[in-house]
C-alpha cells in the first residue's frame, strides 16, 4: 500500500506530465496556425480542368445517346438514359461555372477521339453486354476512377462552390460506374 510520501511523488509527477501536455498542445496550436494553407490550385489549372471535364461530359452525353439508339437490352437502355441526363447536366453545370469564373469554354475533344467514341457507342454489331464489359474493363476500380475529381476538389478550399459541385459530380460518377459494374455482372456473369 502506498504511503502519503509515495502519493505526493505520484501527484507531483502527474502535475509535471499535465504541464508538459499543456506546453505540447500550445506548441501544436502555434504550429498549426503558422502552417502554410493546404495546397491550392492555380486559377489557370482549374479553368483548364473544368473545361476539359465539361467537354468530356458533353461527349459522354452524345455517345450515350448513340448507344441508347442501338441498345436492345431494356435494363441497359433505362440506366443509360439516366446516365446520359447526368452527363449532360454535368457539362452544363461545368460550363456555367467556367463562365462564372470569367472563362469561356474552349476545349474541344480531338476529332479522332470524338469520332471513335461515337462510332463505338453507336455500333449495332457490338452487343450491350460487350460494350458494358469494355467500359468496366477501362474502369475496374470505382474509387480509383473518381479519385482524380476528388483530388481536385480537395485543392479548392478557397472556392467552396466549385469544390462541392465537383464532389457532387463525383457522387454521380460513382453511381454511374456502380450501375455499369452491376449491369456487367448481370449480363456477363
Label every PLM stretch briefly.
Residues 2-189:
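Non-heme di-metal
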